[in-house]
Design a protein with these regions (language model features):
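Active-site-adjacent structural elements that line small-molecule/cofactor binding pockets in enzymes
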Residues: 1-269
Length: 269
């Protein structure tokens, strides 16, 4: 079981984030990641710091040497897929081939609307996500891309240089479209704040989707993000679903349940 730290670049100064990243890099963690929001979540105040995801991940890549660095997840609707493909490759080269790029459809309506993106219905957001995934995957293979699609118009775009060790992750808890997209595109599948039972169900759905398209399910890595309330006086009924609570043995037992359903990595979030 691989252990990581998933620290959103919010409610902290950059110096505090850098200290956390340094701990992850020097203490044997496998993974350190950021996320991609304009506002902190939950939105307690618009004045609280919340750093932009691509820039934050670039800093994370540049100042670490050992951990894989990631974002869970970049919102596909915030950036043209050509730009996100180029950003991912740049971060991958900054890190020496340690970068993982997660992509999702977005969900936080307030930040969409207040930053001028609108907020399309869920089905439309997933359609845009799928088209973006198609283009990013193709751009990372070096051939010129011609695409006159529903959402994006690329005319001979080429992504150079090529990735060194860049991996594509799909993040989410949906039961239908998300597993299908993971089977089709992903090197890894991440689920935030889920129970072992739900994680196991979603992994089975990814496996069935792989079987339908003839893909080897074992190629796909997996992880969950878990809240951290160990030895806390926070009442269990208000702790987030998918959290480590109680003492050391309770946490070990919970991690074991995720391992038993096939999860390969735990990110403390």
């Amino acid at each position: 079981m691989k252990l990581g730290i998933h620290a959103g670049p919010q409610d902290l100064s950059m110096e505090e984030l850098k200290r956390l990243w340094s701990i992850g890099d020097s203490k044997g963690f496998h993974w350190v990641s950021v996320w991609d929001h304009f506002y902190a979540n939950p939105l307690s105040s618009r004045d609280n710091p919340c750093f932009e995801g691509v820039s934050a991940m670039s800093g994370l890549a540049a100042m670490t040497k050992n951990v894989r660095v990631g974002c869970l997840v970049f919102c596909a609707l915030f950036r043209n897929p050509g730009l996100l493909a180029k950003a991912g490759v740049t971060i991958d080269h900054l890190s020496g081939g340690r970068a993982d790029i997660g992509i999702g459809a977005g969900w936080f309506e307030e930040e969409f609307r207040e930053f001028g993106y609108g907020f399309p219905p869920l089905g439309e957001r997933f359609a845009q996500l799928e088209e973006a995934l198609e283009l990013i995957s193709a751009l990372w293979k070096a051939q010129p891309i011609e695409n006159k699609g529903r959402f994006y118009d690329l005319r001979g775009a080429v992504c150079s240089p090529q990735p060194l060790g860049l991996k594509l992750w799909i993040g989410g808890r949906g039961k239908d479209k998300t597993p299908r997209l993971a089977a089709k595109f992903a090197d890894g599948f991440n689920m935030p704040y889920v129970s072992p039972e739900l994680a196991g169900d979603r992994l089975q759905r990814v496996q069935r989707a792989c079987d339908e398209i003839g893909r080897d399910f074992s190629e796909i890595d997996s992880s969950v993000n878990l809240g951290f309330y160990m030895n806390s006086d926070r009442k269990p009924d208000i702790a987030a679903e998918g959290s480590l609570t109680g003492g050391t043995q309770e946490a070990i037992d919970m991690i074991g349940k995720f391992r038993d359903v096939g999860i390969k990595g735990i990110n403390i979030a």
